[in-house]
């Protein structure tokens, strides 16, 4: 066995990290030097000549999950092949927060699947689907964001989820697992999903916490788990990320935010806004505002309300991104 090898970070905690080499048991390693900062699912160079082993290098990341409020950045995980964004109607998820996460995922070129959880609860599920419709593209503008129903109470409650994972997570190479991130606001049922997908997750978390002497709950930092797979199935890694109430996007620009509002580019196919940097807020000659007025004048109130709702959500995201309000004074 070589003294230096490539390992995968399963959980990082300060100057320490649990790492996995191939499918071997995890080992506790230390970061070499203050300039090295590891996050969950990083690929790293591990020197096993020392005791404990040392992480000497972080290999290039294909992407990273992060949220940011001003100068405070929180990197959650790296090298993600699919993000599962968990929603529910009890408690109700926030359409605005969901759009924030989606914009962050699109900016990092991370495919995502919206999972409406707790689908065994009829009333809350209908409320969740109504909220989901607010963030779906208007039918004529773009395809729907991919979504499924799921629940942990019924025998077949996760069948659709397993099928989507099988379709959307091809192995990166013959020697690597695909990596799936589990994300969601607090209370969406993410932990229940995790415990079904990885039955020994609690035991793994407890062992790691005891070794790190952290005593921290599983949802305070990201942790990767190897998902049990039937013989012949591809290997998968599931990354549980901390639940959140807010999701900062000050690291995103206006184009990133616009990626989850395809209506704006579709509307401008018939004619551009007067100003190239139009923020679709109060500027004269704005095609978005014109479309809302046209719908009102034509008595198409449902369309007008849908566009105005989109515009309000857009304004909220834009004010939080690295994209100042560009109200023209020309």
Each model region followed by its residue ranges:
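SH3/SH3-like beta-barrel fold
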Residues: 17-21, 29, 46
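Beta-strand/loop nucleic-acid-binding surfaces
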Residues: 25-40
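A residue-level detector for short acidic-glycine micro-motifs
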Residues: 8-11, 57
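Phosphate-binding glycine-rich loops and their immediate beta-loop-alpha structural context
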Residues: 88-137
